[in-house]
A protein has these predicted regions:
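Hydrophobic transmembrane alpha-helices and their helix-loop junctions in integral membrane proteins
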Residues: 1-241
């Protein structure tokens, strides 16, 4: 019971499922100055660190606990990333992968090996960098165009080349494409899951889920970068600088 209550508090701080529902609304409604720094907020850092301390210092973290925490991470990353694909608000498109990337951190910590824990914490640091960049680009687009609606955007790469370049680099990073930083931390988590899978095949399923989620992350990143910056430029955006 004590472990369950502490786990709930850590998930609420970090934004893991099922305590993630506040994140998309915050990202969609808050000013860019808030959303851009949200991935690196102290609360999220503390949530992940708290989870690490709970799992590996405060309790006797056996195989059952490990399976539960890693499973929560796998479900979180898959559900949140799939949900991002159906969004039309560019900030909500970016908000759900915030939750999904937390799933990778939770899974790494849940696996419990030194490589898994290091991968989860390293992914937290990487997440702060590329997600802040993505939110900054969405804020720049909203400021210049006056809209967050993906259906009213497009073709902005020529008008905002620096913003497009930053969005592209961050999109490749969050998708785990080598040689960008997201690939390194995700690879560490994959390897940790495969290492433990020799003792429990369920972790092989978790590794497959993580890899599939990365492909869905690429799909949502393409949707954001392509929908905003590529394609034809709407007439009402021809004066954008």
């Amino acid at each position: 019971l004590i472990f369950s209550l502490m786990l709930i508090s850590a998930l609420a701080k970090a934004g893991g499922m099922p305590l993630h529902t506040w994140i998309p609304d915050l990202a969609a409604e808050a000013p860019t100055s808030v959303t851009s720094y949200f991935p690196a907020a102290a609360d999220k850092f503390l949530g992940i660190f708290k989870l690490t301390i709970i799992c590996h210092i405060l309790v006797s973290f056996g195989p059952t606990y490990s399976l539960v925490v890693a499973g929560i991470g796998a479900v979180t990353m898959l559900f949140a990333t799939l949900t991002a694909i159906i969004q039309r608000d560019i900030k909500r498109i970016l908000a759900f992968p915030v939750i999904g990337q937390v799933g990778y951190m939770i899974m790494g910590i849940g696996i419990g090996t030194p490589l898994g824990i290091a991968g989860g914490l390293f992914h937290m640091v990487n997440h702060c960098m590329y997600k802040m960049c993505l939110f900054q680009t969405s804020g720049a687009v909203q400021m210049r165009t006056g809209t967050k609606d993906l259906d009213r955007l497009g073709g902005l790469a020529k008008k905002m080349p620096v913003t497009f370049t930053c969005a592209l680099i961050a999109a490749l990073s969050i998708s785990g494409i080598p040689p960008f930083n997201g690939f390194v931390s995700k690879w560490m988590i994959y390897q940790a899951a495969l290492e433990v899978a020799t003792r429990n095949p369920v972790y092989l399923v978790f590794a497959v889920v993580a890899a599939i989620t990365s492909s869905f992350t690429l799909a949502h990143a393409i949707k954001y970068a392509g929908g905003v910056f590529l394609g034809s430029l709407p007439k009402e955006l021809e004066k954008v600088k």
